Amino acid sequence: CSYCIVPYVRGREKSREPKEIIMEIERLVKDGVKEVMLLGQNVNSYGKNLSVPVTFAELLQEVEKIDGLERIRFMTPHPKDLSDDLIDVMSKSKKICNHVHLPVQSGSSRLLKLMNRNYTKEHYLELVDKIRSKMPDVSLTTDIIVGFPGETEEDFEETLDVVRKAKYDSAYTFIYSKRTGTPAAAMENQVPEDVVKNRFNRLLETVNEVSRSISNRYEGTVQQVLVEDVDDHDASYVTGRMTNNILVHFPGSKDLIGTLVNVRLTECRGFYYMGEQENA
């Protein structure tokens, strides 16, 4: 992307051999690990530079076969080449978490072209519809940049439109930061700081408004939670995540860390839930 310094710092993408990945996960599972995260700058590019090419969807299918592994997460897919095969594998999987982080960055097709993102607003929203048609209960999150060089009020309104239509559970929002050596750093029409701050605040308001409108949909249900830690604010509580990556806090001891627990979600508090252990 025209604003990103990562390729200049870390070099071109490299794919690890599938067997190496599988063996590492098997070792982790033997040590008691229940969930793994497969991480890549763009997971859709995985396997293209291997001597025997493998797609990321095929890798996920192999990882799913590992006995004892309960959950598989991954990030980040790029909207420009997220395949139907990957969506199909996710929708049929019993282990891949019900969460897709799909960075949009901007809702303006004009800005997306300047960002060198290689997709349009229309393509992105079609992809969101395709994902939701296969996984109706999916949790969708994103990344958004405000204040990219040349961003107009009309461009920004397009971004707000995508937020409302995609109905994100949450979004990581950023103010554009110039990175020396990137194409974007040399672009004209840098947006004034006061305009950027105003748009950033409006974006946060819209993201929170959309999130609040859908966040309580699990209230009263029983969900499986992987316990991660003792609650930071109350040692008599533990915290963990549902498969859709939403946090849950409920009464429990540190002995529950690393285990999967059925929790009744009693109250939604915005981006997280309070709950009670079911049949404790």
Give, region by region, the residue ranges found by the protein language model.
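Radical SAM enzyme [4Fe-4S]-AdoMet core and its adjacent flexible, acidic
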Residues: 47-68, 115-118, 178-209
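Conserved, mostly hydrophobic/aromatic
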Residues: 21, 38, 74, 102, ...
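Alpha-helix N-cap and loop-to-helix initiation/capping positions
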Residues: 13-20, 51-55, 116-123, 151-158, ...
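Glycine-rich phosphate-binding active-site loops on the catalytic face of alpha/beta enzymes
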Residues: 172-176
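Conserved SAM/AdoMet-binding glycine-rich loop
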Residues: 30-153, 164
